[in-house]
Amino acid sequence: MKTTLLVVGRTVEQHYITAINDYIQRTKRFITFDMEVIPELKNTKSLSMDQQKEKEGELILKALQPGDVIVLLDEHGKEMRSLEFADYMKRKMNTVNKRLVFVIGGPYGFSEKVYQVANEKISMSKMTFSHQMIRLIFVEQIYRAMTILNGGPYHHE
């Protein structure tokens, strides 16, 4: 199984880029993991919120492949503790044959078409985070889940 984090828009602040890349590299010791970046839309000032979600949704759908298991990181998704997320990842590793794709949408969330193709939604918190920060938090949680599953010393309960 390959695990992909699909995100809309690039990370611009160097300290986030460095930390995200560090956790991606650490995670690759355990699983095949990468982050794909969908370029952000240009000239969005002329678009309504719904129009921007639709255009970003089209780009997200284009990046998906047949057989992908699609999990949206969404404020209305299921919340999990780190141990629960590790168990979730273990179940996915045992059942997903192709790609497990976690998706972080644009600033206004997902289009209805993206919601329709999604298999699941999970929430990182009831709080709101910047799109840059949630990428870092999520890749850290993927790494944490892998260390839990492999008996590493990283996580303390």
UniProtKB/Swiss-Prot annotation:
UniProt keywords, alphabetically: Cytoplasm, Methyltransferase, rRNA processing, S-adenosyl-L-methionine, Transferase
GO CC annotation terms, alphabetical: cytoplasm
Claim: Methyltransferase is one of the keywords in the record: yes
The organism's place on the tree of life at top rank: Bacteria
Protein localization: Cytoplasm
GO terms of molecular function: rRNA (pseudouridine-N3-)-methyltransferase activity
EC number(s) per entry: 2.1.1.177
Stretches that traverse the bilayer: none
Catalytic activity: pseudouridine(1915) in 23S rRNA + S-adenosyl-L-methionine = N(3)-methylpseudouridine(1915) in 23S rRNA + S-adenosyl-L-homocysteine + H(+)
UniProt xrefs under Pfam families: SPOUT_MTase
Gene3D superfamilies: 3.40.1280.10
Entries under SUPFAM superfamilies matching the protein: alpha/beta knot
InterPro entries the UniProt entry points to: Alpha/beta_knot_MTases, RlmH-like, tRNA_m1G_MTases_N
Residue sites binding S-adenosyl-L-methionine per the record: 73, 105, 124-129
Family indicated by similarity: Belongs to the RNA methyltransferase RlmH family.
Subunit: Homodimer.
PANTHER family, per database record: METHYLTRANSFERASE, RIBOSOMAL RNA LARGE SUBUNIT METHYLTRANSFERASE H
Function noted in UniProt: Specifically methylates the pseudouridine at position 1915 (m3Psi1915) in 23S rRNA.
Name of the protein in question: Ribosomal RNA large subunit methyltransferase H
Source organism: Bacteroides thetaiotaomicron (strain ATCC 29148 / DSM 2079 / JCM 5827 / CCUG 10774 / NCTC 10582 / VPI-5482 / E50)
Lineage, top ranks: Bacteria, Pseudomonadati, Bacteroidota, Bacteroidia, Bacteroidales
The gene coding this protein: rlmH
